[in-house]
Amino acid sequence: MATSVEYETLYTGQKMPLIGLGTWKSAPGQVKDAVKYALGVGYRHIDCAFVYGNETEVGEAIKESVGPDKGLKREEVFVTSKLWNNKHHPDDVECALRKTLQELQLDYLDLYLMHWPYAFKRGDQVFPQNPDGSVQYDLTDYKDTWKAMEKLVEKGLAKAIGLSNFNKRQMDDILSIATVKPAVLQVECHPYLAQNELIACCRSHGLVLTGYSPLGSPDRSWRKPEDPVLLEEPGIIAMAKKYNISEAQILLRWQVQRRVVTIPKSVTPARILQNLQVFDFSLSEEEMQLIGALNKNWRYIIPLITVNGKSVPRDAGHPLYPFNDPY
């Protein structure tokens, strides 16, 4: 039996499920089955991106699960994708979305996000590089990119548009010129990076915040032995024992109770189901505060590249790098 899910309502009137299936780092060959299983057990929100390289498989899963005689209508499933950095030029934006729609086998997206605030060099190279391994950038202003994204809503190709990995200053910048307002800001969010200030800013402007890596991205390839591990926090372990559930469910319930949308990634059926089963219990006010007190503004997701043989943050030197601001 499918699990029922709670929603946040976007300013557009769309209902966005509080738990979605993340597909970042889900390998081709695994992601199709994961999406099909998720839709079968009650997920109604799938988070995708062109750069993940698996939208064709996600599209196959949606096609086999959604439509006439398949038990699920298209309007019941909330699908998000993201514009990659090499397609920020206003002339490239619609083509980029049409490519994603073609891969996903859809007529429209429920939400289309600008993945990062800065642009890479125009063209078909996803990560255009200089000879030393550093990224080749382009000077396209994200406000011009946004204006092109607004036309996608006018054309019915996206029901809503939004931002990802933007800081408050950059979000305010977009809001100052937007005719079509951003509906969502997607950022890394978990108890070590609670994003309380950003959540408050979003709410004051009518945006919903989506948190990625809600479990601390335990499968990231660049983890270091000294990195803190969310799932091993004694307080989280104790709560999981008390409620007889997993540590992951405690972390997801904390977000759901804060009305933060989260998109945990998994390709394991048992975990996919478990991650959705967070709507039949509540954490006490004290437990919510204990989890919130873990905040240390610790960021797991900082893209790295190899330059001259050394691993360095990919975009930290860029003037639009979002993580130099406090939030």
From Swiss-Prot:
Class in the EC hierarchy, top level: oxidoreductase
Record GO terms (molecular function): aldose reductase (NADPH) activity; S-nitrosoglutathione reductase (NADPH) activity
Keyword tRNA processing set for record: no
GO BP term, pick one: lipid metabolic process
Residues the entry annotates as binding NADP(+): 13-24, 47, 164-165, 213, 215, 217, 265-268, 271, 274-275
Active site as annotated: 52 (proton donor)
EC numbers for this chain: 1.1.1.2, 1.6.-.-
UniProt-annotated site: Lowers pKa of active site Tyr, residues: 82
Catalytic activity: a primary alcohol + NADP(+) = an aldehyde + NADPH + H(+); S-nitroso-CoA + NADPH + H(+) = sulfinamide-CoA + NADP(+); S-nitrosoglutathione + NADPH + H(+) = S-(hydroxysulfenamide)glutathione + NADP(+)
Gene Ontology cellular-component terms listed: apical plasma membrane; cytosol
One Pfam family of this chain: Aldo_ket_red
Listed InterPro entries: AKR, AKR1A, Aldo/ket_reductase_CS, NADP_OxRdtase_dom, NADP_OxRdtase_dom_sf
Subcellular location: Cytoplasm, Cytosol; Apical cell membrane
Keyword entries, A-Z: Cell membrane, Cytoplasm, Lipid metabolism, Membrane, NADP, Oxidoreductase
Family as reported in the entry's similarity comment: Belongs to the aldo/keto reductase family.
Function: Catalyzes the NADPH-dependent reduction of a wide variety of carbonyl-containing compounds to their corresponding alcohols. Displays enzymatic activity towards endogenous metabolites such as aromatic and aliphatic aldehydes, ketones, monosaccharides and bile acids. Acts as an aldehyde-detoxification enzyme. Also acts as an inhibitor of protein S-nitrosylation by mediating degradation of S-nitroso-coenzyme A (S-nitroso-CoA), a cofactor required to S-nitrosylate proteins. Also acts as a S-nitroso-glutathione reductase by catalyzing the NADPH-dependent reduction of S-nitrosoglutathione.
Descriptive protein name: Aldo-keto reductase family 1 member A1
Gene name tied to this protein: akr1a1
